[in-house]
Amino acid sequence: VPQRAGKYGLKVWHGAWLNDNDKENLEQINLLIDHANKYKDTVERVIVGNEVLLRKDLTANELRRYIRQVKQRVTQPVTYADVWEFWLRNPSLADEVDFITIHILPYWEDEPIGLDRREADGQLSIEKHLVDIYKKVQARFPDKKIVIGETGWPSDGRMRSDARPGRVEQVKYFSIFRGAAEREGFDYNVIEAFD
């Protein structure tokens, strides 16, 4: 990916997919380091693991070891990406990274939030949730840049509480999110995939 992205002037946040297999993790780490050093003009940020604490593939200490290995061998800013609450549960990991990457996925939260739900003051509940979570993490880690590494809404699937998946809902979610992001100055990625 970095080679092709560079050809078109695109920047990449390159990640290593970690799991509970040390051999596979070392292969991923070595590939990440190789690409980060080989494509310095394209690889803008480096992500060591995605939601491994959520999935319980690694402990925080095991993850810390991998982050340190990468930080010693690349020049780009290094982070770990997970659902926001896992950063709050493992705050010492912040000492290992250059910035905090959180995932805010209101449809997939333990308590899903529908797009049309409103607060008593009329504000959209989902917008309040996005801003509140961002600010909660920012307050916990005031000396770290906070990046939203994943946000989005599913186009299909089952209802979760009053959270309905769908293409129209995706557009609505992104419109709400983008408005909050512009007002609050979020640095973010949007999840988008295709078959």
What are these regions (language model features)?
Residues 2-5, 25-36, 57-67, 83-99:
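Distinct, well-ordered alpha-helical segments
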Residues 8-10, 14, 44, 82-128:
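Aromatic- and acid-rich polysaccharide-binding/catalytic face
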Residues 15-21, 48-53, 83-86, 105-107, ...:
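Active-site beta-loop-alpha junctions enriched in small/polar residues
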Residues 1-20, 24-27:
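N-terminal carbohydrate-binding/catalytic regions of secreted carbohydrate-active enzymes
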Residues 34-59, 87-88, 147-149:
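Active-site groove signature of glycoside hydrolases
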Residues 16, 70-88, 143-150, 186-195:
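Aromatic-lined carbohydrate-recognition surfaces of secreted/lumenal glycan-active proteins
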